[in-house]
Each structure stands twice: as C-alpha cells, then as structure tokens.
C-alpha cells in the first residue's frame, strides 16, 4: 500500500476512537501516536504479488493453527497503541485469537514495496516491527523488479538481511516454507 501524509484536517484520536472510526471507513489507515495515515491503492503488480503470497501461505498452512491476513488485518505494534496495515501477515500465536480487529504477535510480516513507501518500509516500519519478540521474518517484496529482501531474526536475536532474485529459492523459517522466487513474479511486466 502507499502511505500518505497524515489525513488533514483531523483531530488526534485515541487508539479506541481510531479502531471505531476505522471500521466505518472505505479506505485503510495506519495509526501512529494519534495521527492517522491514509493508505492508498497499489499497482497491479502490487496486488498480484500480495495475492500470490497470501495464497501460497494459505495452501501451506491449511488445517493448522496459524492465521493469514491481508492488508485488512491490522497489526498492533507490541507495547504500543500504534497500528499498521501490512500487505500480508501470519500469526500462530494463540493470544491473537482474542481480538477481532487486529493481531499483535505475527511471526511473519510482508510488505510489497512501492516507490513511495520503500524507504519507510525498510527503515521506520521495520524498527516498529523489530522489537516484537514473536516476529521471525520480515519480507520486503519489490513490485518493480524481481527482488525480495528477507529480514530474518536468528536464534541470537540478531536480524540478518538476505537478498533473493530470479531463480533463487527463499526459505521462511517462521512458517517452515521454501519456494521459488519466480513463482511470485511469473508473468508480471516491469
């Protein structure tokens, strides 16, 4: 999704007010420290990539205890009252079954990169997610070239950045899935 500057003019909302307000909106919004940020639509490639990843994860995890969400499922940033709308997320944590509006403990978060959001997704948004003790994999998927960056948290708690391109095979340890990068990009025009 494409993030825009805070929706203006708009008064600051409490987290509870934001969640109530957001339920009535036609567009998605992220929430950070009382400010609301509109999330615009993405490109055709953005949409196709998100659907393919969601389908891949759903097929792999079918019948298990994990839940897969698209950009309609918000993530509450752990130990805060801030909310993001990643393109795809996976949680296997039973604590996330308590809420119908958001999850807090994803093991995998996917952002399909747009030129306008790439810097934020790699920097500020990653810093928000990185402190989550349950998050193991943060996947940044280009929508303008065949390239995926995987931020993987190792057993020591350090984040490793691995780059994948055409004909590479990517492994998501968080959900025990390995797949060819080409499967995600098949038939897309750049």
Curated annotation (Swiss-Prot):
PANTHER family registered for this protein in UniProt: GLR1098 PROTEIN, RESTRICTION ENDONUCLEASE DOMAIN-CONTAINING PROTEIN-RELATED
One Pfam entry name: Uma2
Gene3D superfamilies: tt1808, chain A
Family membership: To Synechocystis PCC 6803 sll1609 and slr1290.
The protein, known as: Uncharacterized protein slr1290
